[in-house]
């Protein structure tokens, strides 16, 4: 098939590579403009652009697409059979939806209709799901509401973070998109409506999502920490300074304490949760300091017996 591929981050790269390997004609790659990134704020090309250029593919990086007449004319001249959209980061306008015969096909990193939105991987982990997957779907004018084409699923190991899950779902989704295109061409894939009664949302993450609410259960706090890696992570306040909890573990203790209260025992640091359970902090970072193991932190900081996190 003649394709236009729209994608930006590393998550989209395996799908682009799989389409090329399957022999599809990727006539154009559309990606977001180069942006400053990292501590030095160096202007970097998106991973999809780097992959496309290495493969000798033409690349465009429009700032806007909805009313971009030059971009529209370019796509109309290509007349693609399908437009593939994987983590592109832009809402696809109606004129693009109407252009190709097979439509605009999206790889979404959840088992739709669950976790529609910008952060499906993070929210699936944060909500304690034990199974997730990838869905190919035909994009419509709603938010991840289009007809589903194919799905594949995988287990989420109990200690896995969203950051670790990202590349696994990217690799799972790549052959799924290739299979979807083959099925559409052969007439063996039947679009399926989503069950609105089963739909849940996975909205874009904010800094506040990472703030630890100690009234939650130990499992909830732990799952949110796993889900919100690498950003916004899990953080709280200690002595008026931001304390980032880089690594934590489920823990068992016999004693009880008010939510947020800390206990230090044998060089280990624990805090109480809303259900009476405990979590252990293994690695942390106090505002203005470097990231460190808890053992190093406790060597240089003495916590009073009634220390409470969150203040």
From Swiss-Prot:
Annotated family: Belongs to the Fmt family.
Residues that bind (6S)-5,6,7,8-tetrahydrofolate: 110-113
Alphabetized InterPro entries for the sequence: Fmt, Formyl_trans_C, Formyl_transf_N, Formyl_transf_N_sf, Formyl_transferase-like_C_sf, Met-tRNA-FMT_C, Met-tRNA-FMT_N
Alphabetically ordered keywords of this record: Protein biosynthesis, Transferase
Protein name per Swiss-Prot or TrEMBL: Methionyl-tRNA formyltransferase
GO cellular component: cytosol
Function: Attaches a formyl group to the free amino group of methionyl-tRNA(fMet). The formyl group appears to play a dual role in the initiator identity of N-formylmethionyl-tRNA by promoting its recognition by IF2 and preventing the misappropriation of this tRNA by the elongation apparatus.
Keyword Phosphoprotein in record: no
E.C. code: 2.1.2.9
Catalytic activity: L-methionyl-tRNA(fMet) + (6R)-10-formyltetrahydrofolate = N-formyl-L-methionyl-tRNA(fMet) + (6S)-5,6,7,8-tetrahydrofolate + H(+)
Gene3D superfamilies reported for this sequence: 3.40.50.12230
Gene that specifies this protein: fmt
Root EC class: transferase
Entry keyword annotation includes Thylakoid: no
Transmembrane residue ranges: none
GO molecular function: methionyl-tRNA formyltransferase activity
Domain of life: Bacteria
Record organism: Acidobacterium capsulatum (strain ATCC 51196 / DSM 11244 / BCRC 80197 / JCM 7670 / NBRC 15755 / NCIMB 13165 / 161)
């Amino acid at each position: 098939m003649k394709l236009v591929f729209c994608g930006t981050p590393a998550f989209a790269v395996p799908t682009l590579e799989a389409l090329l390997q399957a022999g599809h004609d990727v006539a154009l790659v559309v990606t977001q403009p180069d942006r400053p990134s990292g501590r030095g704020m160096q202007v970097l090309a998106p991973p999809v652009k780097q992959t496309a250029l290495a493969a000798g593919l033409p690349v465009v990086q429009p700032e806007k697409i909805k009313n971009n007449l030059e971009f529209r004319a370019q796509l109309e001249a290509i007349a693609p059979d399908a437009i593939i959209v994987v983590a592109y980061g832009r809402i696809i306008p109606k004129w693009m939806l109407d252009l190709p015969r097979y439509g605009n096909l999206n790889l979404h990193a959840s088992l739709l209709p669950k976790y529609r939105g910008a952060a499906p991987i993070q929210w699936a982990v944060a909500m304690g799901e034990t199974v997730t997957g990838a869905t190919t779907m035909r994009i419509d004018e709603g938010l991840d509401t289009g007809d589903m084409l194919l799905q594949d699923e995988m287990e989420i190991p109990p200690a896995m973070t969203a950051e670790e899950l990202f590349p696994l779902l990217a690799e799972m989704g790549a052959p799924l998109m290739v299979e979807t295109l083959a099925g559409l061409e052969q007439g063996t894939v039947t679009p399926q409506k989503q069950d609105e009664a089963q739909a849940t949302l996975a909205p874009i993450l904010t800094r506040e999502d990472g703030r630890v609410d100690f009234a939650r259960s130990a499992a909830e706090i732990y799952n949110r920490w796993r889900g919100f890696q690498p950003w916004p992570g899990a953080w709280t306040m200690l002595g008026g300074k931001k304390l980032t909890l880089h690594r934590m573990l489920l823990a068992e203790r016999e004693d009880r304490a008010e939510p947020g209260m800390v206990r230090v025992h044998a060089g280990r640091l624990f805090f109480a949760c809303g259900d009476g359970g405990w979590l252990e902090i293994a690695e942390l970072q106090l505002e203005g300091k470097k990231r460190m193991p808890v053992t190093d932190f406790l060597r240089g900081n003495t916590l009073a017996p009634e220390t409470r996190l969150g203040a």
